[in-house]
Amino acid sequence: PISTMRLLLGKLALAYLPFPLVGTVFVLLLSILRHAAPLDFLRSLALVLLVGLGTSSISLGMGAAFPRFDWENPRKQLTMRAGCLAPILYLTYIGVALAIIFGLPALALLVPNLELVLTVVSWLLLIGLTALVAWGALTFGAARLDQVELT
C-alpha cells in the first residue's frame, strides 16, 4: 500500500503542473509587453512558481483534511470547512509572502548598503515559508486522511 503522504505528493505534482506551464507563458508575455529586464522576468517567474506551490499545497491539504466522498456534482466536491479554510489560508500565505518579498528590500531605502543582503534574505525567507506551508498543509491533510474510516 502507498502512504497517504506519497499519494498527496503525487496529487500535488498534478495540481502544481499548471503553474510552471501557464505561469511561464503569462510572465513571459507580461515581461515582453513591459519591456522588462531579464532579471525582472526571472524574479517574477520565481515568485509565481513559489507562491503557486504554496497555494496548491494549501488547497490540496485542506481538501484532503476535510474530504467528501459522496459527491455526485463536481461543484459539491469540497466540504464547507475545506471550501472556507483554503481561501483564507492561501490569501494569508500570499499576503505574508508578498510582505516578505517586497517589504524587506524596501527597507533598503533606509539602509542602501544592505540592499543585496535584504533581497537575498527575503528570497530565502520566502523559500522557507513556502516549504513550511507545503509541508504543513500536506502533513495535516495526510494525518486527517489517515483517520478516515470508510464504511
Describe the predicted segments one by one.
Residues 3-151:
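Hydrophobic alpha-helical transmembrane segments of membrane proteins
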